[in-house]
Amino acid sequence: MRVWYRVRDLDAARVFYTEVLGFAESFVDEDERWAALDRGATEIAIGEGEPEPEEEGLVATIDVEDVKAERERLDKAQVQVGTVLELHGAMRLVDVFDPDGNRIQLAQELP
């Protein structure tokens, strides 16, 4: 499954997703102004248009080794990040927001 996000500036969003969040571009359509990206098992697509960020609904989730460390790194990079949540001692989650307010979630399975 691939989650689609609308972004105001495709070029700026491509930089954010590749350089800040570590995605790799798998496809770019300059004419239609969209790109497909992946990071491990997580696949997203970003397309130029008016963003429609949602608080609920589908969200791309990226598995990371250490949610707290990633949150600190992103916060230092002035990326909007939420509070780290721990679910039943089994998982840590944190919401990250791209420059257009689209929500991405980082997840860490706990031992």
Residue ranges and their predicted role:
Residues 1, 32-33, 58, 70, ...:
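Residue-level marker for the onset of beta-strands and adjacent loop->beta junctions
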Residues 1-12, 41, 58-60, 110-111:
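N-terminal beta-strand motif that seeds the catalytic metal site of vicinal oxygen chelate
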Residues 9-10, 65-67:
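Helix N-cap motif at beta-to-alpha junctions
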Residues 11-24:
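Amphipathic alpha-helical segments
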Residues 16, 68-73:
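Short amphipathic alpha-helices within nucleic acid-binding modules
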Residues 22-28, 80-84:
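Short secondary-structure junctions
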Residues 24-58, 103-109:
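Conserved short beta-strand elements that form part of the metal-binding/catalytic scaffold
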Residues 71, 75-111:
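Vicinal oxygen chelate
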